[in-house]
Regions:
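Insoluble glucan recognition modules
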Residues: 1-219
Protein backbone atom coordinates (compact mmCIF):
# COMPACT_ATOMS: atom_id res chain seq x y z
CA UNK A 1 0.00 0.00 0.00
CA UNK A 2 1.30 3.43 -0.88
CA UNK A 3 1.36 5.45 2.35
CA UNK A 4 0.95 8.66 0.35
CA UNK A 5 -2.22 7.45 -1.35
CA UNK A 6 -5.19 9.80 -0.99
CA UNK A 7 -8.06 7.90 0.65
CA UNK A 8 -10.47 10.81 0.47
CA UNK A 9 -12.28 12.62 3.25
CA UNK A 10 -13.63 10.38 6.02
CA UNK A 11 -17.40 10.25 6.21
CA UNK A 12 -19.33 10.89 9.39
CA UNK A 13 -22.53 9.23 10.55
CA UNK A 14 -24.32 11.54 12.96
CA UNK A 15 -27.30 9.31 13.79
CA UNK A 16 -27.23 6.66 16.52
CA UNK A 17 -28.78 3.73 14.66
CA UNK A 18 -27.94 0.40 13.06
CA UNK A 19 -26.46 0.83 9.59
CA UNK A 20 -25.88 -1.61 6.72
CA UNK A 21 -22.80 -0.84 4.61
CA UNK A 22 -22.56 -2.10 1.02
CA UNK A 23 -19.17 -1.56 -0.63
CA UNK A 24 -18.31 -2.27 -4.27
CA UNK A 25 -14.54 -2.60 -4.48
CA UNK A 26 -14.60 -2.78 -8.28
CA UNK A 27 -15.98 0.68 -8.91
CA UNK A 28 -15.14 2.09 -5.44
CA UNK A 29 -18.71 2.99 -4.55
CA UNK A 30 -20.68 2.37 -1.40
CA UNK A 31 -24.18 2.59 0.02
CA UNK A 32 -25.26 3.13 3.62
CA UNK A 33 -28.71 1.91 4.58
CA UNK A 34 -30.29 2.73 7.93
CA UNK A 35 -31.68 -0.41 9.54
CA UNK A 36 -35.11 -0.26 11.19
CA UNK A 37 -35.21 -0.07 14.99
CA UNK A 38 -38.31 -2.27 15.22
CA UNK A 39 -40.20 -4.96 13.34
CA UNK A 40 -44.00 -4.98 13.19
CA UNK A 41 -46.22 -8.06 13.50
CA UNK A 42 -49.44 -7.52 11.53
CA UNK A 43 -51.76 -10.51 11.53
CA UNK A 44 -55.06 -12.02 12.53
CA UNK A 45 -54.58 -11.11 16.19
CA UNK A 46 -54.58 -7.36 15.48
CA UNK A 47 -56.81 -7.24 12.41
CA UNK A 48 -53.73 -6.71 10.20
CA UNK A 49 -53.51 -3.25 11.74
CA UNK A 50 -49.93 -2.01 12.04
CA UNK A 51 -50.81 0.46 14.80
CA UNK A 52 -52.20 -2.37 16.93
CA UNK A 53 -49.46 -4.91 16.24
CA UNK A 54 -46.77 -5.70 18.78
CA UNK A 55 -43.27 -4.52 17.93
CA UNK A 56 -39.97 -6.37 18.16
CA UNK A 57 -37.02 -4.21 19.21
CA UNK A 58 -33.54 -4.28 17.66
CA UNK A 59 -30.87 -5.50 20.10
CA UNK A 60 -28.05 -6.12 17.61
CA UNK A 61 -27.66 -5.23 13.95
CA UNK A 62 -30.40 -7.10 12.10
CA UNK A 63 -31.67 -8.89 15.23
CA UNK A 64 -35.02 -8.21 16.91
CA UNK A 65 -36.91 -9.64 19.86
CA UNK A 66 -40.07 -9.12 21.85
CA UNK A 67 -43.47 -10.45 22.83
CA UNK A 68 -46.27 -10.99 20.34
CA UNK A 69 -49.79 -12.30 20.75
CA UNK A 70 -50.59 -14.78 17.97
CA UNK A 71 -53.95 -16.38 17.18
CA UNK A 72 -53.57 -17.05 13.46
CA UNK A 73 -51.52 -16.14 10.41
CA UNK A 74 -49.17 -13.13 10.50
CA UNK A 75 -46.02 -11.58 9.04
CA UNK A 76 -43.04 -9.55 10.17
CA UNK A 77 -42.45 -6.18 8.47
CA UNK A 78 -39.80 -3.49 8.87
CA UNK A 79 -42.23 -0.63 8.27
CA UNK A 80 -45.70 0.27 9.61
CA UNK A 81 -47.11 -0.51 6.15
CA UNK A 82 -46.55 -2.92 3.27
CA UNK A 83 -44.05 -0.64 1.49
CA UNK A 84 -40.91 -1.88 3.25
CA UNK A 85 -39.47 -5.39 3.52
CA UNK A 86 -42.06 -8.02 4.42
CA UNK A 87 -40.95 -11.31 5.95
CA UNK A 88 -43.19 -14.26 5.13
CA UNK A 89 -43.29 -18.02 4.89
CA UNK A 90 -40.38 -19.67 3.07
CA UNK A 91 -41.86 -23.15 3.38
CA UNK A 92 -39.17 -24.18 5.88
CA UNK A 93 -39.78 -23.98 9.63
CA UNK A 94 -37.83 -21.18 11.26
CA UNK A 95 -36.79 -19.61 7.96
CA UNK A 96 -38.26 -16.42 6.49
CA UNK A 97 -38.67 -15.25 2.91
CA UNK A 98 -38.62 -11.68 1.60
CA UNK A 99 -40.11 -12.73 -1.74
CA UNK A 100 -43.10 -10.58 -2.62
CA UNK A 101 -45.19 -13.68 -3.17
CA UNK A 102 -44.27 -15.36 0.13
CA UNK A 103 -47.24 -16.59 2.12
CA UNK A 104 -48.14 -15.74 5.69
CA UNK A 105 -46.46 -17.27 8.71
CA UNK A 106 -48.61 -19.89 10.42
CA UNK A 107 -49.91 -20.16 13.97
CA UNK A 108 -47.41 -22.36 15.87
CA UNK A 109 -48.42 -25.83 17.02
CA UNK A 110 -48.94 -24.63 20.62
CA UNK A 111 -51.90 -22.58 19.38
CA UNK A 112 -53.22 -19.18 20.38
CA UNK A 113 -51.19 -17.40 23.00
CA UNK A 114 -48.28 -15.18 23.92
CA UNK A 115 -44.94 -15.86 22.24
CA UNK A 116 -41.46 -14.44 22.57
CA UNK A 117 -40.11 -13.84 19.08
CA UNK A 118 -36.44 -13.59 18.09
CA UNK A 119 -35.90 -12.60 14.45
CA UNK A 120 -32.60 -12.41 12.55
CA UNK A 121 -33.02 -10.50 9.29
CA UNK A 122 -29.35 -11.09 8.42
CA UNK A 123 -29.84 -14.81 7.79
CA UNK A 124 -33.67 -14.77 7.63
CA UNK A 125 -34.22 -17.05 10.62
CA UNK A 126 -36.60 -16.74 13.55
CA UNK A 127 -37.79 -18.53 16.68
CA UNK A 128 -41.08 -18.32 18.55
CA UNK A 129 -41.06 -19.41 22.20
CA UNK A 130 -44.49 -20.15 23.62
CA UNK A 131 -45.06 -18.41 26.96
CA UNK A 132 -46.83 -20.90 29.20
CA UNK A 133 -46.38 -18.89 32.41
CA UNK A 134 -45.64 -15.32 33.46
CA UNK A 135 -43.95 -15.28 36.87
CA UNK A 136 -43.11 -12.68 39.50
CA UNK A 137 -40.30 -13.85 41.79
CA UNK A 138 -39.12 -11.44 44.46
CA UNK A 139 -38.18 -10.83 48.04
CA UNK A 140 -41.84 -11.10 49.06
CA UNK A 141 -41.98 -14.80 48.11
CA UNK A 142 -38.41 -15.91 48.63
CA UNK A 143 -37.72 -15.42 44.90
CA UNK A 144 -40.08 -18.27 44.05
CA UNK A 145 -39.81 -18.64 40.27
CA UNK A 146 -43.16 -20.47 40.15
CA UNK A 147 -45.39 -17.61 41.41
CA UNK A 148 -47.72 -16.99 38.47
CA UNK A 149 -49.60 -13.95 37.20
CA UNK A 150 -52.92 -14.24 35.33
CA UNK A 151 -54.28 -12.68 32.14
CA UNK A 152 -57.48 -12.46 30.13
CA UNK A 153 -55.91 -11.16 26.90
CA UNK A 154 -52.31 -12.52 26.90
CA UNK A 155 -50.83 -8.99 26.95
CA UNK A 156 -51.82 -7.67 30.38
CA UNK A 157 -50.81 -9.79 33.39
CA UNK A 158 -51.87 -9.16 36.98
CA UNK A 159 -51.42 -10.39 40.54
CA UNK A 160 -52.21 -9.00 43.98
CA UNK A 161 -48.99 -9.32 45.96
CA UNK A 162 -47.75 -8.27 49.38
CA UNK A 163 -44.46 -6.79 48.21
CA UNK A 164 -42.49 -7.01 51.41
CA UNK A 165 -38.80 -7.20 50.63
CA UNK A 166 -38.67 -4.37 48.14
CA UNK A 167 -37.43 -6.07 44.95
CA UNK A 168 -38.90 -8.35 42.30
CA UNK A 169 -38.66 -9.25 38.62
CA UNK A 170 -40.81 -10.63 35.84
CA UNK A 171 -39.80 -14.07 34.58
CA UNK A 172 -41.34 -16.46 32.09
CA UNK A 173 -42.02 -20.18 31.77
CA UNK A 174 -41.01 -20.83 35.40
CA UNK A 175 -37.39 -20.12 34.48
CA UNK A 176 -34.71 -17.45 34.70
CA UNK A 177 -33.78 -17.98 31.05
CA UNK A 178 -36.03 -15.06 30.09
CA UNK A 179 -36.74 -12.17 32.44
CA UNK A 180 -37.47 -8.45 32.41
CA UNK A 181 -36.68 -5.87 35.06
CA UNK A 182 -35.75 -2.27 35.70
CA UNK A 183 -37.79 0.93 35.74
CA UNK A 184 -41.59 0.78 35.81
CA UNK A 185 -41.85 2.68 32.52
CA UNK A 186 -39.01 0.91 30.69
CA UNK A 187 -38.52 -2.77 31.46
CA UNK A 188 -35.33 -4.25 30.03
CA UNK A 189 -34.48 -7.72 28.75
CA UNK A 190 -32.77 -9.53 31.65
CA UNK A 191 -32.64 -6.13 33.36
CA UNK A 192 -32.04 -5.30 37.04
CA UNK A 193 -34.54 -5.96 39.80
CA UNK A 194 -37.66 -3.81 40.03
CA UNK A 195 -38.09 -1.89 43.28
CA UNK A 196 -41.21 -1.04 45.27
CA UNK A 197 -42.07 0.27 48.73
CA UNK A 198 -43.37 -2.40 51.09
CA UNK A 199 -47.12 -2.84 50.71
CA UNK A 200 -49.89 -4.81 49.08
CA UNK A 201 -50.39 -3.97 45.40
CA UNK A 202 -52.21 -4.99 42.29
CA UNK A 203 -49.22 -5.52 40.00
CA UNK A 204 -50.02 -5.11 36.29
CA UNK A 205 -47.49 -6.03 33.60
CA UNK A 206 -48.25 -4.48 30.19
CA UNK A 207 -46.72 -6.21 27.14
CA UNK A 208 -48.89 -4.39 24.59
CA UNK A 209 -46.14 -2.18 23.21
CA UNK A 210 -42.51 -1.26 23.77
CA UNK A 211 -41.15 -0.25 26.14
CA UNK A 212 -42.84 -2.81 28.37
CA UNK A 213 -44.18 -1.32 31.61
CA UNK A 214 -45.69 -2.24 34.94
CA UNK A 215 -47.89 -0.41 37.43
CA UNK A 216 -48.46 -0.85 41.16
CA UNK A 217 -51.92 -0.03 42.52
CA UNK A 218 -52.13 0.02 46.31
CA UNK A 219 -54.76 -2.31 47.74
Amino acid sequence: INDTQDYGTPGVITEDAGMLFKVNMLDLTYEIEKLPSVLYTPGNSNGWNFDNSQQLVSYETGKYRGFVYINGIFKFTDAPNWNGTNYGNSGTDGVLSTDGGAGNLELPAQGEGLYFADVNTNDLTYTLTYISAVNIPGGFNGWDINTKMTSTDYLHWTIVADLQGGEFKFAFNNSWDLSYGGAADDLLYNGPNCKAPDGTYLVTLDLTSVPYTYTLTAQ
